């Protein structure tokens, strides 16, 4: 792979991801790898669809949903937890592979007191909980979104984090005591101490500042070596940051708007989006909205954590 110069002067490995699924999602997001079934799941938020892809067979299935699906998580009983607009749901998707419309059950309503938000990014924590943020639906993106934890024992508990416009990048270190997150309108990824049992956070600080003008931090995943991979919207790249914040690797994407990433063994999968691209931009990047893949050279994936559901 070619080597690129980083502003620090250190060499950085750079590579180009290739098309894995020509999904052409309006807003692909929230991609997960299920190591038990060896399939990918992700959402097209604007199309109100849940996607499933089996890399071995090449088979892809989509389900229609009644509301935008902002995020999803694997559950301990084989179901998926689904963050649908203003409520958390659970669905047995594998039992509904022959259906077009996905049947779900409601777990918890979210922010009934705030009509101008919807569920956005989220991820299972290391101890059976689920942490997610809500996105501002105001035209000016005023920061009214909040961060929440959901557990079977306690239901919803709000995390004492700053209000956000577009919460993203939620992921956890191996111990589950450090949480990474961001507000995509600001070019930085934050981190804090996180306690699952009490739903408390502390010691909020900056993990990394993005170096590229116009780049927005989007979805992230932590690998088996503790490094954070972050999809950077508008920059056409995923960046791997070492635990100390140094840049280790850059993966370019054939689309300017990569949105989320996940590791499956030695492969990095990346969702992307077509929303906001005019005809000229789409002609220049016809694969926008697809899922891209990049071989990492060694197995870096951690098994995705699972939410304990009632």
Please place each PLM-identified region on the residue numbering.
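A short beta-strand motif characteristic of beta-propeller blades
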Residues: 16-22, 58-64, 105-112, 155-161, ...
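Beta-rich, blade/repeat-based domains predominating
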Residues: 23-37, 66-84, 113-129, 159-178, ...
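Conserved beta-strand positions in repeat-built beta-propeller and related beta-rich domains
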Residues: 34-35, 40-46, 80-86, 130-141, ...
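A short loop-to-beta-strand structural motif that recurs across blades of beta-propeller domains
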Residues: 49-51, 87, 145-148, 188-190, ...
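Short loop/turn segments immediately following beta-strands, especially the blade-tip
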Residues: 92-99, 192-199, 296-300
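Hydrophobic alpha-helical segments and helix pairs
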Residues: 98-160
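Loop/turn-rich, solvent-exposed surfaces of beta-rich toroidal or solenoidal domains
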Residues: 188, 192, 209-242
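Blade-level signature of beta-propeller repeat domains, shared across WD40, Kelch, NHL, RCC1
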Residues: 264-310
């Amino acid at each position: 792979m070619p080597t690129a110069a980083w502003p620090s002067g250190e060499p950085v490995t750079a590579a180009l991801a290739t098309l894995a699924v020509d999904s052409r999602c309006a807003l692909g997001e929230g991609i997960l790898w299920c190591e038990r079934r060896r399939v990918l799941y992700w959402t097209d938020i604007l199309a109100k669809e849940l996607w499933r892809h089996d890399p071995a067979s090449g088979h892809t299935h989509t389900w229609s949903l009644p509301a935008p699906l902002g995020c999803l998580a694997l559950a301990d009983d084989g179901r998926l937890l689904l963050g649908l607009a203003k409520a958390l749901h659970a669905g047995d998707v594998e039992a509904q592979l022959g259906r077009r419309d996905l049947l779900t059950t409601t777990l918890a309503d979210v922010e009934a007191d705030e009509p101008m938000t919807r569920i956005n990014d989220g991820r299972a924590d290391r101890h059976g909980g689920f942490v997610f943020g809500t996105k501002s639906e105001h035209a000016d993106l005023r920061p009214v979104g909040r961060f929440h934890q959901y557990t079977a024992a306690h239901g919803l508990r709000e995390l004492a984090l700053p209000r956000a416009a577009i919460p993203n990048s939620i992921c956890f270190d191996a111990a589950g005591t450090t949480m990474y997150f961001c507000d995509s309108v600001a070019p930085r990824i934050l981190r804090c101490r996180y306690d699952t049992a009490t739903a408390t956070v502390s010691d909020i600080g900056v993990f990394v500042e993005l170096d590229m003008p116009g780049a927005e931090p989007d979805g992230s995943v932590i690998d088996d070596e503790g490094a954070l991979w972050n999809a950077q919207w508008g920059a056409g790249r995923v960046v791997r940051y070492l635990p100390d914040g140094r840049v280790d690797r850059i993966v370019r994407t054939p689309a300017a708007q990569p949105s989320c990433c996940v590791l499956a063994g030695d492969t990095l999968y990346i969702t992307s989006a077509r929303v906001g691209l005019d005809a000229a931009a789409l002609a220049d990047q016809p694969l926008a909205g697809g899922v891209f893949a990049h071989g990492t050279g060694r197995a870096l994936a951690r098994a995705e954590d699972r939410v304990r559901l009632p």
